[in-house]
């Protein structure tokens, strides 16, 4: 873990590093060695030096002019062909992807997203978060995936995004019924292959078809099943994204 972090910080050369309070000791040593002098903490309980510093900031927001081709994020790949590579994503990449998916997936006023994905991955960090953000939607934020908690929260939501294993675990919950998903309109899966058995059981159990999509760290979303169609398992024919 420390070796990976040393590589990421050294490669990205960030001006600021934010970590959990319990990891401050070893993370700050790596950051200082790499030349990053600003290391702040942010805890799950909404405490930490980042918020302490923010409390003393001016209420005036100063906009920084940005072009579409300006770098917005460096997202590190899983490293399947060697060491993780930093995928350089621009502001134009992020904005166009969010705009296209908002239209294509039918985001609308009143939508509520259940977010139970890790935010170190493009699915949770950009696709889910930016979808809710650009639509101005409420988000039910879960720090980790808990199938029982997700089932309890389903009646409050309209959109859920997950990887196939999350759907398998939800299907193991007796509380997953058509009544529980009565307000849901969209279930999305990606990041790994969705088995046809899971696809069919989900549709039979809930009355909803899981919408499959495909993307990667370097491009965000590339293709997606149509939203307003009775799609087949494994069909991802239409190119989408930015």
Regions found by a protein language model. Give the residues of each.
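Hydrophobic/aromatic ligand-binding patch that stacks against planar heteroaromatic rings
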Residues: 30, 131-132, 202, 221
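Conserved pre-ATP/AMP-binding loop-to-beta segment of ANL
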Residues: 57-76, 82-83, 106-112
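Short beta-strand->loop structural element characteristic of the AMP-binding/adenylate-forming
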Residues: 1-18, 85-88, 115-116, 137-144, ...
């Amino acid at each position: 873990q420390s070796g990976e972090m040393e590589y990421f910080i050294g490669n990205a050369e960030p001006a600021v590093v934010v970590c959990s309070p319990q990891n401050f000791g070893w993370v700050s040593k790596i950051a200082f060695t790499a030349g990053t002098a600003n290391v702040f903490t942010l805890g799950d309980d909404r405490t930490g030096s980042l918020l302490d510093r923010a409390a003393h900031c001016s209420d005036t927001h100063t906009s920084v002019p940005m072009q579409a081709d300006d770098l917005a994020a460096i997202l590190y790949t899983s490293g399947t062909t060697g060491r993780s590579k930093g995928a350089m994503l621009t502001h134009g990449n992020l904005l166009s992807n969010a705009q296209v998916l908002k239209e294509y997936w039918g985001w609308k006023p009143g939508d509520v997203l259940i977010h139970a994905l890790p935010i170190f991955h493009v699915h949770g960090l950009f696709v889910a978060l930016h979808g809710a953000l650009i639509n101005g939607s409420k988000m039910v934020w879960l720090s980790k995936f808990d199938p029982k908690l997700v089932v309890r929260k389903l009646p409050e939501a309209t959109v859920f995004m997950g990887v196939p294993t999350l759907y398998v675990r939800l299907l193991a919950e007796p509380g997953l019924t058509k009544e529980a998903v009565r307000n849901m309109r969209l279930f999305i899966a990606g990041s790994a292959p969705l088995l046809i058995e899971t696809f069919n059981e989900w549709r039979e159990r809930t009355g909803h078809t899981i919408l499959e999509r495909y993307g990667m760290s370097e491009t965000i979303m590339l293709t997606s099943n149509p939203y307003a169609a009775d799609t087949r398992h494994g069909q991802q024919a239409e190119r989408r994204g930015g």
